[in-house]
């Protein structure tokens, strides 16, 4: 089967600044991989490169065996951006059914996607009348309705209450158990423990790539917040460079 995503020496420059600096990593199939890091660390740029909509300076990104952005991937990759990507003048149901039709799916699949994100009670509402968190979930339903092999989710739980966050993560893991690969970004470190594997980015560099348990063990602490702080401090630029030094300590694949 191989890995769902293979990134090698990825470089991205934007506005005269290096946004991603030589990132190499893999994302295994059928698992939830978390992309963690502070705001502005390069998470969204990394996801855009995986989807194939980001101009890259160097390196390669392979997705499901194809170069990122290949036409063959259009119906295999679902992408949820931070900004709502649905039509405000249509209802939640109309949006979901429209995107379902684009993927050759029917009304039943659209209605199921709405239910899966907890919006069944708001299916008849215009998206423009929804709260920010509800709009995000409407976008999520549209990203999932095509049953893609790979789902890229950029901050999917921002603005959601704790109960709904838990429900969404349960849904993500159910999808992974059924064979879907998920790459989920967050700047909220308490969501890291919900992932099967973690990629930690800071200032455009990969400083950790391993399971939550292995990262805690490498840092010598039980708390992931503290583990990340220690890895960040240990990964300050030095002779070996931050990414290389930390990947060596955690034993992560890159």
Where are these regions (language model features)?
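Helix-to-loop junction immediately C-terminal to a conserved catalytic motif
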Residues: 51
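Conserved ABC transporter NBD signature motif
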Residues: 55-73
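Conserved ABC ATPase "signature" region
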Residues: 97, 101, 107-122
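Catalytic Walker B motif of ABC-type/P-loop ATPase nucleotide-binding domains
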Residues: 151-155
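ABC ATPase "signature
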Residues: 209-210
